[in-house]
Amino acid sequence: MSGWSHRHILDLASFSLEDYSSVLELAHRFRSMPVTGARKLPALQGRLVATLFFEPSTRTRSSFELAARRLSADVQSFTPASSSLSKGETVLDTARTYVAMGADVLVVRHSSTSVPEQLACALDRSGERTAVLNGGDGLHSHPSQGLLDLYTLAHYFDSQNPLPEALQGKRIVIVGDVLHSRVARSNLWALTACGADVVLCGPPSLVPQDFVAFVEAPPPGQSHDPVQHRGCVEVVRTLEEALPGADAVMTLRLQKERMHQHLLTDLNRFHRDYGLTHERLKLCGKPVPLLHPGPVNRGVELGGSLLDDHSISLVEEQVRNGIPIRMALLYLMAAVESSSDPSLAAIG
């Protein structure tokens, strides 16, 4: 883990294969912790993690707070409804309040793109040592979700060694509202960086053709590692094109709250054309796992019986894996700050 250099975690565009390996390897160690007895590690004892969620969340917020507590960190939660935002306080001033209270990490979720990055830059300019972890910003990025999905798939393909190599050459199909999904963007970066080929499936209004260019272009000021084999991205319009040969399928929620009026999709028609069922998954030609980042619209993205079929659905596994992945991220950020690895002696 000595190669880890990300003080802030804002997206996955700049992650190297070594970075993905560091997160997945550490998360797997945390996942292997016994579920009974002493469930806390002293790694972040004396540290303060503040969760600043300016947008509603159930899974992500709870997962980060559980992750921080399992590493013995103190946790402070921010709730917009009872905050000074209603009195005109800015997001930056709110963040600075928690920094002044001694927060070591701010986990920030916001409906507007780039807010976590703007906060990180502002804190850096003022010489603060507080790190910022993006808990989801607008349509841009949701790095911890992308990483937990990556780990869930790697563990499915190789439970003994769930590292990026387990994704090499796999065909992963993502169905649904890609346009409005920060999860899709993070998954595209993670999966292709680890050598998986990704097929995006949906109507043109929800799956633009230019998403191929989105992944193939390197981040500003960077270049792709010429040695690293990156997966390809393909856009198709029907499940009949997408599913044959798939190794895993992920479906995305229709995010009506982010859609302009002319993009609103008839739900019955969407389910007819793109809703996943047991019968449709037979097009894959073999048993494949099903993922969904949640929350799920039953009867829209997929049939309720499919969601409840634990021989296929990895949705609850994704939720479980969110905790060790977020423990790994918080641990690695703390290691950068202290220039040494906090103790992991309790898990060997």
Swiss-Prot record:
Its EC number is 2.1.3.2. Pathway: Pyrimidine metabolism; UMP biosynthesis via de novo pathway; (S)-dihydroorotate from bicarbonate: step 2/3. The keyword Transferase applies. It catalyses: carbamoyl phosphate + L-aspartate = N-carbamoyl-L-aspartate + phosphate + H(+). GO terms for molecular function: amino acid binding; aspartate carbamoyltransferase activity. Pfam families: OTCace (PF00185), OTCace_N (PF02729). L-aspartate binds at K87, R182, R253. Transmembrane segments: none annotated. One of its GO terms (cellular component) is cytosol. It is an enzyme of class 2 (transferase). Carbamoyl phosphate binds at R59, T60, R109, H142, Q145, G294, P295. Coiled coil: none annotated. It comes from the Bacteria. Keywords: Pyrimidine biosynthesis, Transferase. One of its GO terms (biological process) is amino acid metabolic process. Catalyzes the condensation of carbamoyl phosphate and aspartate to form carbamoyl aspartate and inorganic phosphate, the committed step in the de novo pyrimidine nucleotide biosynthesis pathway. Belongs to the aspartate/ornithine carbamoyltransferase superfamily. ATCase family. Heterododecamer (2C3:3R2) of six catalytic PyrB chains organized as two trimers (C3), and six regulatory PyrI chains organized as three dimers (R2). This is Aspartate carbamoyltransferase catalytic subunit.
